[in-house]
Curated annotation (Swiss-Prot):
Entry protein name: Catalase-peroxidase
SUPFAM superfamilies: Heme-dependent peroxidases (SSF48113)
Transition state stabilizer (site feature) positions: R88
HAMAP family linked: Catal_peroxid (MF_01961)
Record's catalysed reaction(s): H2O2 + AH2 = A + 2 H2O; 2 H2O2 = O2 + 2 H2O
Gene name, Swiss-Prot/TrEMBL: katG
Amino acid sequence: MANESKCPFNHAAGGGTTNRDWWPNQLNLKILSQHSPASDPMGKDFDYAKAFKSLDFQALKRDLTALMTDSQEWWPADFGHYGPLFIRMAWHSAGTYRTADGRGGAGSGQQRFAPLNSWPDNVSLDKARRLLWPIKQKYGRNISWADLIVLTGNVALESMGFKTFGFSGGRADVWEPDEDVYWGSENKWLGGDNRYGKDPESMQPPGEGTLVAEPAEHGNEESRTNQGERNLENPLAAVQMGLIYVNPEGPEGNPDPVASAKDIRETFGRMAMNDEETVALIAGGHAFGKTHGAGPADNVGPEPEAAGLEEQGLGWKNSFGTGKGADTITSGLEVTWTTTPTKWSNNYLENLFGFEWELTKSPAGAHQWKPKNGAGAGTIPHAHDPNKRIDPTMLTSDLALRFDPTYEKISRRFLANPDQLADAFARAWYKLIHRDMGPLSRYLGPELPQEELLWQDPIPEATHPLVDDSDIRALKGKILASGLSVSELVSTAWAAASTFRGSDKRGGANGGRLRLAPQKFWQANQPEQLDKVLKVLEGIQNEFNAGAAGKQVSLADLIVLAGNAGVEQAAQNAGHTVTVPFNPGRTDATQEQTDVESFGFLEPHTDGFRNYAASTYRVPAEALLIDKAQLLTLSAPEMTVLIGGLRVLDTNVGKTQHGVFTDRPGTLTNDFFRNLLDMGVEWKPTSKTEFEGRDRKTGSVKWTATRVDLVFGSNSVLRALAEVYASSDAKEQFVTDFVAAWAKVMDLDRFDLRQ
């Protein structure tokens, strides 16, 4: 601006010192309102599943196949084929998934946004997505970016001679970055000290992320690298800030293949991959393409989020030589693994075991490996000069597959049996790109495999007539006459439904897995009480199914219906007549359809809705409540009304009375909020996590509470919501809102209802 000093606006709206700057420990409630309809340009009536079904899928695949060899001057294809670049794009989109909280993954196209679009491990993937833009533009809303990124990786494999296991669409895009994902607390790229506990002073304040609580279960927070062990902070699944998995040079840049194997096993395991799947993914993925380290990293400019406007969303502008083609700098490593980098082969393993390797450095100065004594010289094609041949090279993380005893055994078997590698890679790749898709009812398209896969948490289809309104009324009558309390009915239904995670769409009441291992043994589910309730409900189920002339009710449905009956009874106790929405159609999975180890990741070690914590955590309980609420896709008002209702329904684990601010438990009243906001009560801590509320006049203890309870009076936003429900005219609204939020949680996994 020519006269900038006279501009009346020195700062734009939203700038300046923020509340978070003043109070860095402030509870982050914004994660409960992200991805609102206001941010979605597609409109509230847009149905992506319907749009995808109208897609000319085969025409799209033909266009993608043609793109693979349509090299562009502005970003030339290595070896004349973009396939390896697109495989990396899809892999790095899906590979952010982690089992601990189900977050990350390819499910919403987050690679387009910060921080992922600017991670050091994603250098040059901005170019991959830009190459795809003409195709995305052509097909528009019928293919999401999330689906297109993954499908392009699949087509890339097929175009280079590999037979994939299948593909499913159904990943709807979002339009802003996920703010709920904890990627670590380091404040510099490729930092890793905090996640291994070596620099605790620089960690973010409590409330940021979920740090390890129980060493026996998750490992200590302190690093024990000197003893050969590294203990990675939960829920992270990458060794350094901005990496997908491991440092390819070795742990902290130390070129030790055996140590690298430990990092690989830890990080791939946290992405739900076992040793065989891990070897297959690495050996299969590295059958193609190359890495890029033509020159020193100081030639590379800022990442996309820091680049100038003129770069138009691209980043990492390279001043080395031409800045592209043979002069490309991505990881700083310059490795080509095979003689056939654009064709499926077993040459990766042939080279890995066919040569003895010695340490060398890339042109950028990064640790990598070459065959000893010049073996294999000139056997590898040059990516951009058909008249040149180069030597084989490997990464430290590649040599891990040879020098780790377990990985070596698997790798040698794949070397001797290429068909086994092909099958294992096809299956592991399919799992990688679909791990966060949820139940099969969300899968779309003509290339779905017919085989039932255990990691998909299969649920049988209902093959019998469902219960009707008359049956539902009769069943609720039997449930309420069974002798089970409101608390028992509601607690059991919550235990089943609240395992749902909106992140990877796992869990929920459908499947009836509450009656199976491991869920029936979880401490949070109160196994003794659960066994009692399930026996009663199974009796009602058996009686109904024996005399229903073909109609059947699953235990999964009956558990939810029992919870609904409890809520309706509690509302009636308070003078309100309500009917909780109920949608039959859930079925019961078998123990054989249930991966006990995999379901273990859904176990709630804390659940603020039930005032439950298995142990003391570094992160405050109220922050963990917000985390749980976000996984349940709840808004702040929904979370608030559920807490208030569940407390007065006496659903705390172990029947503790913390937060049960009522003298009429089992009655659906707004007593929790009225008594929480009562200025006649003074609160004092009895420990870091528990409090007593004493009558200001008499000094006698009226109530006890946890941090989760008191945050609804302490946090200004939550207090504003609590005041709504504590008001004299809010009794009916409270019941109505509780019923709506309850019904939402009960149906979170019913994707079949939304098709």
